[in-house]
Regions:
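Conserved phosphate- and dinucleotide-binding cores of soluble alpha/beta proteins
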Residues: 1-23, 27-55, 59-323
Length: 323
């Protein structure tokens, strides 16, 4: 997860200059948040990326807030145990006259559509085309706001560097809008090729397709559709899907980072080399990242007590997270 976080920060956040973003909940995004003050700082990116967040007050954001990375967070809702820390940082959180945080789920969803440069979240399965879902035969997990956060709002006209750069990298943009320029929201899925329990992350067909049939649903429970997804980050590397000219090239890019899964077994090494030369696939070495440096030493906080210390004793973790 730390290696994936390093690749994401250098190969996506830094490359596109992402200023406004939303993170899903999970270990992958927590790893990114926790290495901003260390690895991100070593790249000289503070003040250049990750300044404004549409995000619940994640405890793993405390080190980034305390080191001046996150300038403000506007939240969908709160987080148990963060009340006193939030109250002490009215410069970062939206605090009302009574000293408590003002959150608004609807405003956050709108901001996710039209203000955020990027959505980053974890997923359980990605199929050979790039469709993503957390609904599997072993675990039907809800999507939360991911379908809203993880889609490209066609009504957006607010230009930012990251949005504009991504849109101008879309391979078939001239076929879609002719001479007119358009941006595109960065939609990033982070995944492990094989989970700790042995379940493959990359599959030929989503379990969601069979779930639709079994449950008599009108639509497969797909969390993020392939045409909205711009990047996939696995421990193998990054696939820049929006740069692909057609579905076949997209499928080859996915195979290149799918590891020892049924999708990854179909990888063509010669095609992967071509995609790397084109900048459509990037491995850690392409990004100048030494895999051996991806260690827990990069985490600004290595346990819950560290987070409490970073907060000046204001974060009060729920009992189940204490040890």
């Amino acid at each position: 997860r730390i290696l994936k976080a390093m690749m994401a920060i250098k190969g996506i956040y830094g490359e596109y200059g992402v200023q406004v973003l939303n993170h899903g909940v999970g270990f992958d995004t927590s790893a990114i948040e926790l290495i901003l003050p260390t690895y991100g700082e070593s790249l000289g990116l503070r003040g250049k990326i990750c300044r404004h967040w549409v995000l619940n007050p994640h405890p793993t954001m405390i080190p980034a807030i305390e080191t001046g990375w996150a300038e403000n967070l506007y939240s969908f809702g709160s987080e148990v145990g963060m009340e006193e820390y939030i109250k002490a940082r009215p410069d970062v959180f939206a605090i009302g006259p009574d000293g408590t945080m003002r959150s608004n789920r609807a405003f956050c969803q709108a901001a996710g559509h039209y203000a955020a440069d990027m959505f980053v979240g974890s997923t359980m399965q990605i199929d050979r085309y790039g469709n993503s879902s957390t609904a599997t035969k072993n675990n039907v997990a809800g999507f939360g706001g991911a379908p809203n956060m993880g889609c490209d709002a066609k009504g957006r006209r607010h230009v930012t560097e990251a949005w504009f750069k991504c849109g101008n990298e879309v391979a078939n943009r001239a076929e879609l809008t002719g001479e007119c320029l358009r941006g595109k929201k960065l939609v990033v899925q982070v995944i492990t090729t094989i989970s700790e329990k042995g379940f493959p992350g990359f599959v030929q067909e989503l379990d969601a397709i069979q779930l639709k049939k079994n449950a008599g649903l009108d639509l497969e429970p797909v969390m993020i559709y392939s045409d909205d997804l711009t990047h996939i980050v696995s421990e193998i590397g990054i696939a820049y899907l929006h740069k692909c000219c057609n579905m076949e090239e997209r499928m080859n890019a996915i195979r290149a980072i799918a590891g020892k899964t049924e999708v990854g077994m179909l990888e063509d090494p010669a095609e992967t080399l071509r995609l790397r030369k084109e900048g459509i696939v990037k491995l850690p070495e392409d990004l100048g990242i030494d895999r051996s440096t991806a260690t827990r030493e990069l985490l600004a906080a290595k346990n819950m007590k560290d987070l409490v210390d970073w907060s000046g004793g204001l974060y009060n973790p729920p009992a189940k997270f204490r040890n």
